[in-house]
Amino acid sequence: MMLDVAPPRFRVEEEDERHGIFVAEPLPRGLGHTLGNALRRVMLSGLPGAAVTKLRIEGVQHEFSTIEGVREDVVDIILNVKQLKFRLERDEPIELQISKDGPGEVRGSDIELKADVEVVNPDAYIASLSEGGHLDMTLTVERGQGYVPAEQNKSDADPIGVIAVDSLFSPVEKVQYRVSETRAGARVDLDALTLEVFTDGRLGPREALREASRKLIDFFGLFAEGYQGAGAAEEPGRSGGRPVITDERPIEDLELTVRSYNCLKREGVDTIGQLATMTEEELMNIRNLGMKSVDEIRSKLEEYGYTLESGRE
């Protein structure tokens, strides 16, 4: 299909920290929609980011509480906290503190930061304190991808007063694409694909497009002849024992919940191949990884043709 088409060109029409317009042309007719839709979907739901997953406020037992000297009730504070955007350069969860006395407003800039973490929107409003008011709050920030409801962020190990919140990890706010006609030489039936990407500042638009492209390349590699990234192979001369699985795809491709993903990363489990060689008992021995998470991992592995006990079926 590509033999009689000039090599496609990529160009940047507009770009700043949060917005970019990118064009690829000429493409064979129909391929513009194929690529545009795939890239759009991956950018919106398949890229990792960092967000608040839990919070704890001194003196508060549950989310339907009020705090003396604070204008907002806890429900409103949670809604405001969910708007905070973070860059986190570590796989492990991190706890951040806010401690402020009134009168005055509490904003993202009042968060006491640690190494490897940054608040992208420090002007984000959290609460207002009156004279004598005080807010002492701990935020748990984790990496993940897509949208994770509060229920999945809960843990039986959480002490009383820890409130799980909905987390929107995706750094991409909106993606639009359009396909127009273009020409190359005598050919006039070709596609020009224009992608417009809006991010929230945690990731630049060109970087978002690049990361989405890499993810798609990894998945399309499954169907390419001679692809070596997936499948199980037994070591030469080895009989019995645990199989060696050479699936180098990252565990991010499994789209696990935040808890399962972070527990595995802390244990150094980075690829699907590593995970597929593990047993249920080994997973249960990982700190904070309960039976619910093990069941989730088993289900995800089965979608890829693996079992916990014996690797590829």
Curated annotation (Swiss-Prot):
One of its GO terms (biological process) is DNA-templated transcription. Its EC number is 2.7.7.6. SMART domains: RPOLD. One of its GO terms (cellular component) is cytoplasm. Residues 242-313 are annotated as: Alpha C-terminal domain (alpha-CTD). InterPro entries: DNA-dir_RNA_pol_insert (IPR011262), DNA-dir_RNA_pol_RpoA/D/Rpb3 (IPR011263), DNA-dir_RpoA (IPR011773), RBP11-like (IPR036603), RNAP_asu_C (IPR011260), RNApol_insert_sf (IPR036643). Residues 1-227 are annotated as: Alpha N-terminal domain (alpha-NTD). The keyword Nucleotidyltransferase applies. Coiled coil: none annotated. GO terms for molecular function: DNA binding; DNA-directed RNA polymerase activity; protein dimerization activity. SUPFAM superfamilies: C-terminal domain of RNA polymerase alpha subunit (SSF47789), Insert subdomain of RNA polymerase alpha subunit (SSF56553), RBP11-like subunits of RNA polymerase (SSF55257). Pfam families: RNA_pol_A_bac, RNA_pol_A_CTD, RNA_pol_L. It catalyses: RNA(n) + a ribonucleoside 5'-triphosphate = RNA(n+1) + diphosphate. Keywords: DNA-directed RNA polymerase, Nucleotidyltransferase, Transcription, Transferase. DNA-dependent RNA polymerase catalyzes the transcription of DNA into RNA using the four ribonucleoside triphosphates as substrates. The N-terminal domain is essential for RNAP assembly and basal transcription, whereas the C-terminal domain is involved in interaction with transcriptional regulators and with upstream promoter elements. Homodimer. The RNAP catalytic core consists of 2 alpha, 1 beta, 1 beta' and 1 omega subunit. When a sigma factor is associated with the core the holoenzyme is formed, which can initiate transcription. Belongs to the RNA polymerase alpha chain family. This is DNA-directed RNA polymerase subunit alpha. It comes from Rubrobacter xylanophilus (strain DSM 9941 / JCM 11954 / NBRC 16129 / PRD-1). The lineage of its organism: Bacteria, Bacillati, Actinomycetota, Rubrobacteria, Rubrobacterales.
